[in-house]
From Swiss-Prot:
EC number(s) given by UniProt: 2.7.7.13
GTP-binding keyword on record: yes
Positions in coiled-coil regions: none
Protein name (database record): Probable mannose-1-phosphate guanylyltransferase 3
Function: Catalyzes a reaction of the Smirnoff-Wheeler pathway, the major route to ascorbate biosynthesis in plants.
Reactions performed catalytically: alpha-D-mannose 1-phosphate + GTP + H(+) = GDP-alpha-D-mannose + diphosphate
One CC-aspect GO term: cytoplasm
InterPro entries noted in UniProt: GMPPB_C (IPR056729), GMPPB_N (IPR045233), Mannose-1P_guanyltransferase (IPR050486), NTP_transferase_dom (IPR005835), Nucleotide-diphossugar_trans (IPR029044)
UniProt GO MF annotations: GTP binding; mannose-1-phosphate guanylyltransferase (GTP) activity
Residues reported in the UniProt entry to bind GDP-alpha-D-mannose: 66, 90, 92, 127, 154
Family annotation (Pfam families): GMPPB_C, NTP_transferase
Length: 331
């Protein structure tokens, strides 16, 4: 399964972004890929082009092009006679996507490039974006600073004017390390501070943290989407087709996907249970991810950032702990 199509909050990761782009007035989305389009990706495009009434196309690399080269490759798809700027998003990023606000920010500052930044408590493990005091103009980038220079980091969402493409050669190029510093040196790069939550969910631990943040956001903005009931604790998202048995305790911070069957006496917290999963009686799953069409046996325990792939069968009373990643096999 291509990572952008992995479920998050009961929809493919990338669908969160495409819906936000649609809401901001975008009419065409270009997916940059570095492999043959698997059938599942083609099916996704066919389904959601129709549902969202938005054009979705591919730009495929034949060799690695870094984070900037794919933009040069897709130039003909990104530039038209209007000269309007275009968004670039990292597919692993989950947030509230304030894209309309970013368009206004870009216009107000007459920026060549605008980047979204988020504020973190410990910036030492990130590349820090340093802005001029009292303004949003980017001065420099400092990779994993040893001393405090700021707490803003790149959030992986950009709005670029077409002229940025003139700076990018069709070769392996880093937009963060090669292109943005040049634009910043010309005082044409601006950083918008992202309101609300943000997480790069590309790793299992961050996925689970991001899910908690996402559910908190739903609680604030659309609480009617969350489950309620005597067996629900905190923020829980349950697909309408899922079946939950008696005596279960679900939550907090749980997502249950379509077609799931949760038998009686099951305990779930801090976890994702994806489409078609069967959790048998009295099993317990915490801080873990259970992939599509898997089965977890009676009294089994799955916890501590364990990831089960597709079609995994966990035997009755088995215990799985701490980062085990298993795909399409019995345990």
């Amino acid at each position: 399964m291509p990572k952008p199509l992995v479920d998050f909050g009961n929809k493919p990761m990338i669908l969160h972004q495409i819906e936000a782009l649609k809401g901001a007035g975008v009419t065409e989305v270009v997916l940059a890929i570095n492999h043959q389009q698997p059938e599942v990706m083609l099916n996704f495009v066919k389904e959601y082009e129709k549902k969202l009434e938005i054009k979705i196309t591919f730009s495929q690399e034949t060799e690695p092009l870094g984070t900037a080269g794919p933009l040069a490759l897709a130039r003909d798809k990104l530039v038209d006679e209007s000269g309007q700027p275009f968004f670039v998003l990292n597919s692993d990023v989950i947030c509230e996507y304030p894209l309309l606000e970013m368009i206004e920010f870009h216009k107000t500052n007459r920026a060549e490039a605008s980047i979204m930044v988020t504020e973190v408590d410990d910036p030492s493990k990130y590349g820090v974006v340093v802005t001029e005091e009292g303004t949003a103009r980017v001065e420099s980038f400092v990779e994993k600073p040893k001393h405090f220079v700021g707490n803003k980091i790149n959030a992986g969402i950009y709005l670029l004017s077409p002229s940025v493409l003139d700076r990018i050669e069709l070769r392996r190029t880093s937009i963060e390390k090669e292109i943005f510093p040049k634009i910043a040196s010309e005082k044409k790069l601006y950083a918008m501070v992202l309101p609300g939550f943000w997480m790069d969910i590309g790793q299992p631990k961050d996925y689970i943290t991001g899910q908690r943040m996402y559910l908190n956001s739903l609680r604030e903005k659309t609480p009617q989407e969350l489950a309620t009931g005597d067996n629900i604790i905190g923020n829980v998202l349950v697909h309408e087709s899922a079946v939950i048995g008696e005596g279960c305790l679900i939550g907090p911070d749980v997502v249950i996907g379509p077609g799931c069957v949760i038998d009686s006496g099951v305990r779930l917290f801090g976890c994702t249970v994806m489409r078609g999963v069967w959790i048998k009686e009295h099993a317990c799953i915490s801080n873990s991810i259970v992939g599509w069409d898997s089965t977890v046996g009676r009294w089994a325990r799955v916890f501590n950032i364990t990831v089960l792939g597709k079609d995994v069968n966990v035997a009755d009373a088995e215990v799985y702990n701490s980062g085990v990643v298993i795909e399409e096999q019995g345990l």
